[in-house]
Amino acid sequence: MSIVNISCYKFVTLNDREALKADLGARCLQLGLRGTILLAPEGINVFLAGTRAAIDAIVAGLRADPRFADLEPKLSLSAEAPFTRMRVRLKKEIITMKMPVVRPEEGRAPAVAAATLKRWLDQGCDDEGRPVVMLDTRNDYEVAAGSFENAVDYGIGVFSEFPPQLQRRRDDYAGKTVVSFCTGGIRCEKAAIHMQEIGVERVYQLEGGILKYFEEVGGAHYRGGCFVFDAREAVGADLQPLGGRVHC
């Protein structure tokens, strides 16, 4: 497999989006990359595929900007590029929640690392003895490809449906530790901040999402694959395309 696929995001205030769009678009085309970069006032969201050299070059270029110096892309390999073209797009949000009061660039919710989460799930509680609730913030068609064992999901069709569903179920999480998760971390970060704001007592986001969990600890306590928004459709715990091997 010769194609490297990366995804990463950063919540950070961007006031020069037009200039960034032109610059990143030109660099990606020059490097022969395919994929999508989203730019919004709240930050950047990146999905790219290309040769190892091209990916290394664009990541180095992004990190040269102090705003993106701590970007930590999640990597996987494939035989072919899962994208057909290169696009840099300007958006109102890098992930649409329609909750303007939620401003992740002003501060993150607490995060739990993959190894720590695995330990909690192994022992059936967090380190303080609280029950752990895995809360899937993804859309219903993504959940159908796979999810954590016994995870709660709201059967939503789009992420903007998450806040009202959460509001109705807020009291279900009293006395429990809630871990929000998604594909790569962006939605669970927004979701965790929103949960804190409406008074859910103990909330963590899964650092780096499902893909980082797969990368660091494999598929423990997870069933099926992880839906991805490209031609691969879903990847397994080994981060390889599942094709027809998805089991729900």
From Swiss-Prot:
Entry's family note: Belongs to the TrhO family.
Coiled-coil segments on the chain, per record: none
Its job: Catalyzes oxygen-dependent 5-hydroxyuridine (ho5U) modification at position 34 in tRNAs.
NCBIfam families per record: PRK05320.1
Signal sequence region: none
Highest taxon listed in the record's lineage: Bacteria
Protein name, per record: tRNA uridine(34) hydroxylase
Keyword Oxidoreductase included in the entry's annotation: yes
Active site: 182
Gene Ontology MF terms in the entry: oxidoreductase activity, acting on paired donors, with incorporation or reduction of molecular oxygen
